[in-house]
Amino acid sequence: MKHFLTLRDFSKEEILSLVNHASELKKEPKKLLQDKTLAMIFEKNSTRTRMAFELAITELGGKALFLSSNDLQLSRGEPVKDTARVIGAMVDFVMMRVNKHETLLEFARYSKAPVINALSELYHPTQVLGDLLTIKEWNKMQNGIAKVAFIGDSNNMCNSWLIAAAILGFEFSIAIPKNYKISPEIWEFAMKQALISGAKISLSHDRFEALKDKDVVITDTWVSMGEENEKERKIKEFEGFMIDEKAMSVANKDAILLHCLPAYRGYEVSEEIFEKHADVIFEEARNRLYVVKALLCFLDNQRGRE
């Protein structure tokens, strides 16, 4: 069964097809999943992700079932595989926002319904789909190639974008602090994919080096959920990595800024630059709705072929 746990399980053609279908559904809504049910399991708080998934399945003609960790016997020690067997047999899709990626993998092994990663500590693939739709809409993809820079933490967003860029053949530069590392296994996968796709990928510890000649600039919060007690340390480590006027001046003249939100002005991005690119950033957030619609339809079609 086809799940959506990471973009590395999808081909270039499948990823682009999802983005194109999302664009079509944005222009012309259709009720393609009449009476289908989506279970939404949250171990972490969410604003945009919950709204995108709940609205997506509703507007497609289905219904959503919200389940926090407190609603499930998982919080009392029930094995993940048992919960997966029950929920996966009752619904058509399962969306999960989890603390550990291993929870997703275990759930997917035993679920009879396709499982979607709505965020783990390793990956955030639905966000990247939304980013890709936004890049398409702002005409920042020339001949199928975008020039993208990611500035910030070597986190789930960085990992997901690295994989996407490698599969799609993009020019992609990363800038992270010196004591931060990309997962060796994820980096190796990306390098192998880049050889196939022709992607040009680079890693540095200098934001200006990464930003040079880029059309798309991506950043993310420096302090992720669950890292609040590390805030002071991380702010010191990320000194010099803010996306401000000086940083954006190194990118191409009409470069756009993307941020998955929530944004913390004065840290990863300046107030002035955030507001300058607010139209793009909030359309990026809205685009999550349409890529989720396309993803649900894709998984439903895949399941129908089995």
Curated annotation (Swiss-Prot):
What reaction is this protein's catalytic activity? carbamoyl phosphate + L-ornithine = L-citrulline + phosphate + H(+)
- Predominant subcellular localization, coarse grouping: cytoplasm
* EC number, as in UniProt: 2.1.3.3
The residues forming a coiled coil are none
The record's keywords, sorted A to Z, are: Amino-acid biosynthesis, Arginine biosynthesis, Cytoplasm, Transferase
Biological process (GO), any one: arginine biosynthetic process via ornithine
In this chain, L-ornithine is annotated as bound at N156, D220, S224, M225
A single Gene Ontology MF term assigned here is:
ornithine carbamoyltransferase activity
- Give the record's pathway: Amino-acid biosynthesis; L-arginine biosynthesis; L-arginine from L-ornithine and carbamoyl phosphate: step 1/3
* HAMAP family named in the record: OTCase
Query: What is known about what this protein does?
Result: Reversibly catalyzes the transfer of the carbamoyl group from carbamoyl phosphate (CP) to the N(epsilon) atom of ornithine (ORN) to produce L-citrulline.
Tell me its family: Belongs to the aspartate/ornithine carbamoyltransferase superfamily. OTCase family.
Protein name as annotated? Ornithine carbamoyltransferase
Organism from which the protein derives: Campylobacter jejuni (strain RM1221)
Source organism phylogeny: Bacteria, Pseudomonadati, Campylobacterota, Epsilonproteobacteria, Campylobacterales
